[in-house]
């Protein structure tokens, strides 16, 4: 830890320690060699400007020792002249000017008039700018604020010479108000102020009247228009007035620095304040416009996002209400099965069971008709093709042909078996030599130990063949 002090102490740094020693009250006079050494450290180190400004602020703030304040002001003047823009840009900040130097002008510090004038001269000179392009807007603001409060700044060293030169201006010379580029030659360290002749003052007042008119127009447009419902022509005019107002504000600030006329200075300050309010109002209006446009854009994107599905349509579930499928009752199904079982054996129509899905052709739905007809979709076997095919070759002529029935319920099966018709008389007599492949009926797997009332059907052709063989042997 350097010099036994905390890192938060501005005097703990190398340049801070040197500033503390060079501005100590025990020093008899300014040590210019030490001041130059401090300037070298500020220019050669990265944190030198920042550390130096912090140390100077600590030395001056709330210090009633006039000797230390005088030494500090001398060091500041030396650093401003010999250090670069990095130090100058920090020394002209409002934090240092207003919160440190201006507070020393308070009567409680009882500074000598010479020291007070030196502080005011610093503020006035720095507000005129630096050759390195340093931003001096904050020190200009402090300077104008002091002028508005009636603070009298001391005359510069070259002021008498400047007034004498201003009095020798030829009357034939144009009396236009100098613009900002023209003032660059006037704003010099040796000749920082000018005195205006009556013709120049009259021209300046006429231009200030134009600025006042522009301010009134800008204020009226801002009051009549609201962000989101503004008139485009008014906004275009407002934009032009804002650009012109910015340029006039720069000229007014330059004139305030160089003009040595109390009445003109007071009017310039008042016009600058009104113009600044109009400019700030336009900037606020523009920010509100941008905010409304951004909010509208966000709402549009949110609406578009909410209207789009979060997943592809193929991945979505169908939440539409399901229409219930009418299911025929059990009694109607049993009645239809019984009617089908009484048809001719030549019919191979399937027995209707309880199907959850209705027929795709309502006009052919067997449940909706009293006279049941065999659909053309199913092939029919007549007695003719029964004769051509050697069916039931292993049966006796008096054998009873079993019809395949629905296995839906035991009741339906029993009703179908009771209504089986006899074998038609036109059926040809089967011979012993005619062989027919065995017919297999539906066999269901079941547990013989499980209690059930359903009828079980199994292969019966093999049993009848054996029985017929035994009869033939006899």
Swiss-Prot record:
GO cellular-component term (any): cytosol
GO biological process per UniProt: cell surface receptor protein tyrosine kinase signaling pathway; negative regulation of mitotic nuclear division; protein transport
Membrane topology: Peripheral membrane protein
Subcellular location as annotated: Golgi apparatus, Golgi stack; Endosome membrane; Cytoplasm; Membrane
Post-translational modifications: Phosphorylated on tyrosines by LYN. Phosphorylated on tyrosines by FYN.
Record protein name field: TOM1-like protein 1
Keyword line: Cytoplasm, Endosome, Golgi apparatus, Membrane, Phosphoprotein, Protein transport, SH3-binding, Transport
Motif segment (SH2-binding): 457-460
Region Interaction with PIK3R1, residue ranges: 441-444
Domain VHS stretches: 22-154
Region spans: Interaction with GRB2: 392-395
Subunit structure: Interacts with LYN. Interacts with the SH2 and SH3 domains of FYN when phosphorylated. Also interacts with GRB2 and PIK3R1 when phosphorylated.
Natural source organism: Mus musculus
Motif range (SH3-binding): 420-424
Tissue specificity as recorded in UniProt: Strongly expressed in brain and kidney, expressed at intermediate levels skin and heart, and weakly expressed in thymus. Not expressed in liver and spleen.
Function: Probable adapter protein involved in signaling pathways. Interacts with the SH2 and SH3 domains of various signaling proteins when it is phosphorylated. May promote FYN activation, possibly by disrupting intramolecular SH3-dependent interactions.
Coiled coil regions, renumbered to chain: none
Chief subcellular location: Golgi
Database matches in SMART domains: VHS
Pfam hit, one: GAT
Residue segments, region Disordered: 153-180, 291-317
PTM-bearing positions, type Phosphotyrosine: 457
Phosphoserine sites (modified residues): 170, 313, 320
GO MF terms held by the record: clathrin binding; phosphatidylinositol binding; protein kinase activator activity; protein kinase binding; SH3 domain binding; ubiquitin binding
Biased composition (Polar residues): 165-178
Family assignment from sequence similarity: Belongs to the TOM1 family.
SUPFAM superfamilies: ENTH/VHS domain, GAT-like domain
């Amino acid at each position: 830890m350097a010099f036994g002090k905390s890192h938060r102490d501005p005097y703990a740094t190398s340049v801070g320690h040197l500033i503390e020693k060079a501005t100590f009250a025990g020093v008899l006079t300014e040590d210019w060699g030490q001041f130059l050494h401090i300037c070298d450290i500020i220019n050669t180190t990265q944190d030198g400007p920042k550390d130096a400004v912090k140390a100077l602020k600590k030395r001056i703030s709330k210090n009633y020792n006039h000797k230390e304040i005088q030494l500090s002001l001398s060091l500041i003047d030396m650093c401003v002249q010999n250090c670069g823009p990095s130090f100058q840009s920090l020394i002209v900040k409002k934090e240092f000017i207003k919160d440190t130097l201006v507070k020393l002008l308070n009567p409680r510090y009882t500074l000598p008039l010479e020291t007070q004038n030196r502080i005011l001269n610093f503020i006035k000179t720095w507000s005129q700018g630096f050759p390195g392009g340093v931003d001096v807007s904050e020190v200009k603001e402090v300077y104008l604020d002091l002028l508005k409060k009636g603070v009298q700044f001391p005359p510069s060293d070259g002021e008498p010479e400047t007034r004498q030169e201003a009095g020798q201006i030829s009357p034939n010379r144009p009396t236009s108000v100098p613009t900002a580029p023209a003032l660059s030659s006037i704003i010099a360290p040796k000749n920082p102020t000018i005195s205006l002749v009556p013709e120049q003052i009259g021209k300046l007042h006429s231009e200030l009247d134009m600025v006042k008119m522009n301010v009134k127009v800008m204020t009226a447009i801002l009051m009549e228009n609201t962000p989101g419902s503004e008139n485009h022509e008014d906004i275009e005019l407002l934009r032009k007035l804002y650009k012109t107002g910015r340029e006039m504000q720069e000229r007014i600030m330059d004139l305030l620095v160089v003009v040595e006329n109390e009445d003109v200075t007071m009017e310039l300050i008042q016009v600058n304040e009104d113009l600044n309010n109009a400019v700030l109002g336009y900037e606020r209006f523009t920010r509100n416009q941008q905010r409304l446009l951004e909010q509208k854009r966000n709402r549009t994107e949110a609406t578009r996002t909410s209207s789009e599905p979060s997943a592809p349509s193929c991945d979505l579930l169908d939440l539409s209400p399901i229409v219930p499928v009418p299911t025929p009752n059990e009694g109607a199904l049993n009645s239809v099965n019984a009617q089908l079982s009484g048809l001719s054996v030549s019919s191979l129509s399937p027995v209707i069971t309880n199907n959850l899905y209705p027929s795709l052709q309502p006009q052919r739905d067997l449940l909706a008709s009293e006279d049941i007809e065999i659909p053309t979709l199913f092939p029919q076997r007549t007695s003719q093709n029964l004769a051509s095919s050697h069916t039931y070759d292993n049966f006796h002529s008096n054998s009873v042909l079993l019809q395949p029935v629905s296995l839906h319920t035991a009741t339906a099966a029993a009703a179908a078996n009771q209504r089986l018709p006899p074998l038609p008389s036109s059926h040809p007599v089967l011979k012993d030599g005619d062989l027919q492949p065995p017919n297999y009926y539906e066999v269901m797997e079941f547990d013989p130990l499980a209690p059930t009332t359903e009828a079980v059907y199994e292969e019966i052709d093999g049993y009848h063949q054996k029985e017929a063989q035994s009869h033939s042997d006899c």
